């Protein structure tokens, strides 16, 4: 079944910034997709096209990207009469139309909007759920419910506090299914709120962009201490591990790292990559920290390689790899990390996202599917993580509807699968896939 109409519009994301939404029509109906956007972005990401007109949305408008869909992509795509199940053909056609290495002509936000909508239409065309269609595209017989990674304490570029490290997460890997993982996550979140309120006062429980708390603390181990207390109070010390997203590129200065980067600059306090690595090792020793994302700058390859060789935890590449097969290949060769953070808008199409995922998995890496800090109510990544069988997803705290939209969709998927539902749990790094 081919596409009859495509219409893009500008909508607002969860931070009040414009983003692209695409409606795609076939004889089966209308299929809608919205594109997310990040705050801490890697320099190697595909280009998100913004208007740059300061008189409108402070320069963040997406009218140009919307126009590219409506005026450049739509007619040419419809003319080709591709079947919507041919995801790869359609994505490659758009990439050829754009013709640039990083999608800078149309913008990754234009191409991805269409790509996501095509994927939803393809599932409807086959009469299967979206997660099943994605599993087929990836060549998987199985589908797997992921372990959620709830970002419950925010720092870095996501928060107005002095905390340098961007995310402190809880992963309920000891849960027996996804529903239980949600309950554990929510209960720890509520306990954490009470712990923070008791220690720092009521205004310390205001939430950040991703629904986590952003108490005004400076020391990163203080955040870990708060998590440890909340996990114990909730009664789940044996079921939860801690994950971190350091986003170290945000505080990399002159070859060193500034753990107080939100204060006036003082090079005397900068630390080396080795010192930062030792700090992480102390976290791993003192707390159940089992996953660290972006521990070093996106181009500090030596520090990555040294650290990954020295620890047995999950080391996740985000700014390092930006879901880009070329960067992933480089990281594989250098043994820089052992897990890919998969963000569809970093690479800009469904086909390339699947390719990046398969490349990582074929090299023995784990894969964690991720939201962005500027999200929408679109739930595509919930189906994506189930279909790609990656075993882990991070899409914020159990708070704020644009985050819960994904978690709730995962609960619906688990319910729909019934007795066939498999939960990654303790195998979150390497789920058993058929």
Curated annotation (Swiss-Prot):
Highest taxon listed in the record's lineage: Eukaryota
Sequence positions that bind Mg(2+): 245, 293, 318
Species of provenance: Salmo salar
Active site, UniProt feature: 210 (proton donor), 343 (proton acceptor)
Cofactor note: Mg(2+) is required for catalysis and for stabilizing the dimer.
Subunit composition and interactions: Dimer.
Alphabetized HAMAP family for the sequence: Enolase
Function comment: Glycolytic enzyme that catalyzes the conversion of 2-phosphoglycerate to phosphoenolpyruvate.
Compartments where located: Cytoplasm
A GO CC term attached to the entry: phosphopyruvate hydratase complex
One example GO MF annotation: phosphopyruvate hydratase activity
E.C. no: 4.2.1.11
Protein residues bound to substrate: 158, 167, 293, 318, 370-373, 394
GO biological process: glycolytic process
Name recorded for this polypeptide: Beta-enolase
Cofactor or coenzyme needed: Mg(2+)
Keyword ATP-binding: no
NCBIfam families found in the cross-reference section: eno
């Amino acid at each position: 079944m081919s596409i009859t109409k495509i219409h893009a519009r500008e909508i607002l994301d969860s931070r009040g910034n414009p983003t692209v939404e695409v409606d795609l029509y076939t004889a089966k109906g209308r299929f809608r997709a919205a594109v997310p956007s990040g705050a801490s972005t890697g320099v190697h990401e595909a280009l998100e096209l913004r208007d740059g007109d300061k008189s409108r949305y402070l320069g963040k408008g997406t009218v140009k990207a919307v126009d590219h869909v409506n005026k450049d992509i739509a007619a040419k795509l419809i003319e080709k009469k591709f079947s919507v199940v041919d995801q790869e053909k359609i994505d490659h056609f758009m990439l050829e139309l754009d013709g640039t290495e990083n999608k800078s002509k149309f913008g990754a936000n234009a191409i991805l909007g269409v790509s996501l909508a095509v994927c939803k239409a393809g599932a409807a065309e086959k009469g299967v759920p979206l997660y099943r269609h994605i599993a087929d595209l990836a060549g998987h017989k199985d589908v797997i419910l992921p372990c959620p990674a709830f970002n419950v304490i925010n720092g870095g570029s996501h928060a107005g506090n002095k905390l340098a490290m961007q995310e402190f997460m809880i992963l309920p890997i000891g849960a027996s299914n996804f529903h239980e993982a949600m309950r554990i996550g929510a209960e720890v979140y509520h306990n954490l709120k009470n712990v923070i309120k008791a220690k720092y006062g009521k205004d310390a429980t205001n939430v950040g962009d991703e629904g986590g708390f952003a108490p005004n603390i400076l020391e990163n181990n203080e955040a870990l201490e708060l998590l440890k207390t909340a996990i114990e109070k909730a009664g789940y010390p044996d079921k939860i591990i801690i994950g971190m997203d350091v986003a170290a590129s945000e505080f990399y200065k002159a070859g060193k790292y500034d753990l107080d980067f939100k204060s006036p600059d003082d090079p005397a306090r900068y630390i080396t990559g080795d010192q930062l690595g030792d700090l992480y090792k102390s976290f791993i020793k003192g707390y159940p920290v089992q996953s660290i994302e972006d521990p070093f700058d996106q181009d500090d390859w030596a520090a990555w390689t040294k650290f990954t060789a020295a620890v047995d935890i999950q080391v996740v590449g985000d700014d390092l790899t930006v879901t880009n097969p070329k960067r992933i290949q480089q990281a594989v060769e250098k043994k820089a990390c052992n897990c890919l953070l998969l963000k569809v808008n970093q690479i800009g199409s469904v086909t390339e996202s699947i390719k990046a995922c398969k490349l990582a998995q074929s090299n023995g890496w784990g894969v964690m599917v991720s939201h962005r800090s500027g999200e929408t109510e679109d739930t595509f990544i919930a189906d994506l993580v189930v279909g790609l069988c990656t075993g882990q997803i991070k899409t914020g705290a159990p708070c704020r509807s644009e985050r819960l939209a994904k978690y709730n969709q995962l609960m619906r998927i688990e319910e729909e699968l019934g007795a066939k539902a498999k939960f990654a749990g303790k195998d979150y790094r390497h789920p058993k896939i058929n």
